[in-house]
Amino acid sequence: MPRTSRNVRATEVATTAIPPSNAATDTTVDTTVAPTIASADAAQHASNISSSQLGPAGVSDKVPSSVVTNDGDISVTPISENAAQLASSNQPASVIRNPVAAATISIVNPSSLRCQQCGAKFSSMTQLAEHVRTEHRTGAGSLVTSPAINQAIESWLLTWEDLRLLAPTIATDALNKYMGEAVAKAPLLIVEDEGLCTSFLASDTISIAGLQREIVGFTWFMETLQMIPALPEGAVNHPICHTGWASKDSVSRHLDVRLSPPTHGGCFSIHYRTVEGIRQGHAIQPSYFPCQRPHAGPQVRSVQSQDQQVYSVDSGPDPRSRGRYVRFFDNKELFAVAYPGREVLMEANRNALFLDESLPDRVGCIGRAQNVSGDVSAHIDTYELCDDLTLAIREMYHNMLFSMHLDPASVMEIVQDVSQQLVAASIPFAQTDTILCPWAASTPTLQLSQVLNLLNVANNTSAALPLIEAAATLIMGITPLRMEPRILSEAIKRVPETTTIVPSPTGELTRLLKPLGNDYSAIYRCIAGCLYSGLVQMFISADAYPDPTQSITSIPAIWKSLIVMLAAPMTTDPHAAVKAFMSMANLLAQPEPIIIPAPGMTQSTPAVQFSHPEVWPPGFVDPTTLDRNRTPLLHALATMIHAHWPQPGVIQYGRSRLGSANLFLPANQLTYPWPTQPLPRITVGPTYDSAMFRWIDSVFGFYINVVNSRYVATIVGDTTRRTLTGLMAALMQVKTMTPFYIERMCPTEVAVVGGVTVFPPFQVPITRLDPTQVITNVMVSPRGPPAPCRRSRRSHRYYAYAAPIPCQSIPLRLSLLCCVRQTEATLGPSYHYGSAITPMFLSEELFTRNQRAVIASEAFVCARSIIAQCVPDGFQVPRPLQDFNQYNASGSTAADLLKAVDDMFKTAFDIDGSLIEGIGLYGDPRVADLSVAYLRQNGAVERVHTAPDSSFLHEAMQVTSQVMVNEPNLWAIARGDIILAQNATHNNWDPLNPVGLPIFARGGPNVHVVGSRGMIIPQPGGLAPMIRDDAGNPQQIEGDWIYPISVLQVSVANFRDHVWPMIQAGRTRVRIEMGHFLYSIHYHEPFGQITEAPAIDTWLAGISPTGIPPFPLSAPIPQITIPITARRVYFGYCTMNNTGATFSTLGAAIQSAWGTDVTIQRNRWPALIDPNYIPGQSQLPARVQLYNPLRRYNYRYPSLKGMLYIPGVE
């Protein structure tokens, strides 16, 4: 019918719609429109042409034609019929019904013809008809959508294809790379040492060169034949602590402890100013800290010594010699000192007389059995140079390794259980005790390591992301399913779309489905995030949600909300459900308002901000509170979420023999966000009864109802509505393997990966839709007795619950719908997984987590013990260094000690990354134990105390510390006090052994004790000043005085000005109460005059409230013949005997004719010279023996691949 005429001129009708200045606009709204109906009617009326003469397409495409319905929608017409009508629209009519045939026809833009399907313009009808015939023809293989949409689909597929090229397509290569990196992260537990097991080197402190030999004949003979003495022959000899001097280790621990002899030239290397200096093993300044770190210094040094000695004693070759088996050394010096009793010298000197007492059967191997049942024996017992302190440390370390040992039968069971019975393994050889596989760890050790992991990662996303990427790489490497976006494109292409609405529903869908980055692994990252739900939170990124300013009529907003709703259950975000709900509530803010009780928040607040239980809308928490009549869609959505949100499942993984790191879950269990079913062993296929399928079906059903609702249908038009519902229905009908994969296959992959990752899974319980059960915090708190120095600290340390890691919803949505399919037509799950995961069990990376956990536990116990000995807080730990004066250590000092121990353990065991340093990064490291807990919204707290297991290295550290206390001279530490008094003599002088020297003490006659401040009281009239004693009375400086070292530290200036001159004059004697102190000794010739005054004055100048230098002592060099001596003046000597560090004097002579005379201590050599010695007896910790029997091991360390037989593996 002709249109109703309007009295409007065509030239006065505007072609551009200008919205009001305050109108809401959007970038997707096109404000430029075609000529209006009024302009078309005016043109038709002015030309006197009826509508039938214009053809079915009207005048070009500038005005509506008969294909437009009364509602404004485009009438759906088959393309073939529409093309035919379009082709015949310009044919001349056979009968012209208009009487005015010659009237002038005024056509709007008659020179341009436009295609109705794609919008292409043509200058003639012939070109338009040919275009329609070639580009829009119908056929079995043709597309039913417009070329613009086809182009969008192809562009979308191409983008995903480019991303797929970045994915690891060769699973074996990806797995091998991860396995190699995991093995590299394993600590260096085993270092073989074929050298001597000793840390003390008997060396010449003062050489005998220049002294007259008593007997020269045989000495010349030895020098001519280059015979090497087994014992030192210097004028003064000391056993020097030098770890590794006789080692022939396979790999260095890089923690050699090398203390120089306590002489003036070498004392600086054993006196430390800072903990860093202790750790590095060299001096920054020759200063000792009795008031701050006398406990810490020896403790840290003992840790360094024990870490250096963690070797496996290896057996060397045993050639036959003099009827006994001894080992052969390439180094002839080492061979000489290894068996000091093997050759007895003919010269009657001090060393020869001692070696003449050695027993022949105490040299070399004990017994001769080298083979057992045709195989090399597991161990060999032998006598050789070996100090029992080093031997004890190594035996304790060997016990630690043996406690971690797994026999082949256990390894086979572990491999089968960890692989979920998918890897068939068997033992190809019989049991033997010659192998050592330190791969196990106890559950308490793994739990403590897990807490340390939490401290190291905390809420640091950069530290947590590599964990997710590593697990995702493993899952991608073993899964048989791959993303295939073409499945989705085929479904989209089957839906016809002839709408001209901008944006097009199909075009907008393909635009939104384009990846924004490297998202091919998004679904695998989300699955991997389930393994670490206590450390990280996988949440949908904010840009995936619809714009809250949009309405429900916005097609992009509808698609975004649908995508978010589908992907939400795949994340570990506890607020994912309410965020997905609010993505729709934002769009329905105007037609369906609901109550948002949170202050400052409304229904238009972006959905991503609803990330706390207190802001959850009550209508979502309880859908029955929503009015079905006023909010039908939101009520239906909340009800659907509560009905179909997936219930979590449980997965068994690992094996109890390996231990379990679970803290909040039962041992060897994993929580899974979806219900689980057993893996089918024969075949796979799509499933339509799983929780995921029901979720997908219910989500699409809801959004179809949204599109059909009055809010949308009355606005977008019937054609657009049918296109939207058609697309949703087509996507819902896609036969995807994803539901089957998530329910039956993915749990197996998660269980296998969770059992082999270096970082064990750390999970918290999954909370569903109850806001009161949402976990808001995961915290680590120190445990231990309260201390005054820690009262101001917080009792807990809180950490944000999980590090946030965003993920794109697009690949999740694709994977959930249809972009995952099986790679083979006939897939056998057992065969596929057996082949895919076998590379994981060909190396020892399976046990890397256990080995790192053991080392972390050992480091924590050692660091805790060192710090506790500096802080008397009541923590029950052995304190062998209690006799050393010690002030309470501050938190910064404890942090330095913690870092020193952490660095030493990482250096000794070649560990990269964090170990125990996380304890000191977020608070005071002075802790006894650690506990971990999570806090729910309702206030409920679940706490787990992670007490460390027994520590072998801590026991070794305690033994070393006890030896330091009992034999401090070996570490240049003297016991007792120092007496400053003038002693002028021509005779011998031995300040370390004060026999015959005057000693006075507190309570003696005429002995005064200085007051607490060392105050000097000047006297008038030229009288000498006086000193206030401890009773507050002034006393004359002359006489005997007792000075506590603490008083001297604060009054050393007065001491140097008034007391020290009186001591040099011989009128005053002072006893400085030290307890223990470092010392150095200067050996000099007895022929020249000497005075100690300059050295003592320098020592006094170095005293400060923060430290005391080593006390300088002097002694003449022992002489072979009686010398002519000069007058010498000495001032300082000890009050106790401190010659324990002197090995001998004048070893090449019969005895010392003049000077200090020390013989070889026979109680250090009972295994060599005592017939009544029982093998295995030790005098530790009272005394260090230098010669002992030891057991050398012939272990083999098979690889996992070499231990087990796995079919199909070469």
From Swiss-Prot:
| Keywords per UniProt | ATP-binding, Capsid protein, Helicase, Hydrolase, Inner capsid protein, Metal-binding, mRNA capping, mRNA processing, Nucleotide-binding, T=2 icosahedral capsid protein, Virion, Zinc, Zinc-finger
Q: Where are the zinc fingers (C2H2-type)?
A: 113-136
The primary location reported for this protein is: virion
Q: Where is this region: Disordered?
A: 1-28, 294-319
Compartments where located: Virion
Per UniProt, the ranges with Low complexity bias are 299-315
Pfam family of the protein (one) = Lamba1_VP3
Q: Which InterPro entries match?
A: Lamba1_VP3, Lambda-1/VP3_sf, Znf_C2H2_type
Q: Which residues form a coiled coil?
A: none
Molecular function in Gene Ontology: ATP binding; hydrolase activity; RNA helicase activity; zinc ion binding
The UniProt entry's GO biological process terms, in alphabetical order, are: 7-methylguanosine mRNA capping
Q: Name one GO cellular component term.
A: viral inner capsid
Protein task: Inner capsid protein that self-assembles to form an icosahedral capsid with a T=2 symmetry, which consists of 120 copies of VP2, with channels at each of its five-fold vertices. This capsid constitutes the innermost concentric layer of the viral mature particle.
Query: Which family, according to UniProt?
Result: Belongs to the turreted BTV-fold inner capsid family.
Subunit details = Homodecamer; each decamer is made up of two conformers of VP2, called VP2A and VP2B. 12 homodecamers assemble to form an icosahedral capsid. Interacts with VP6.
Write down what this protein is called. Answer: Inner capsid protein VP3
Q: Which gene encodes it?
A: S3
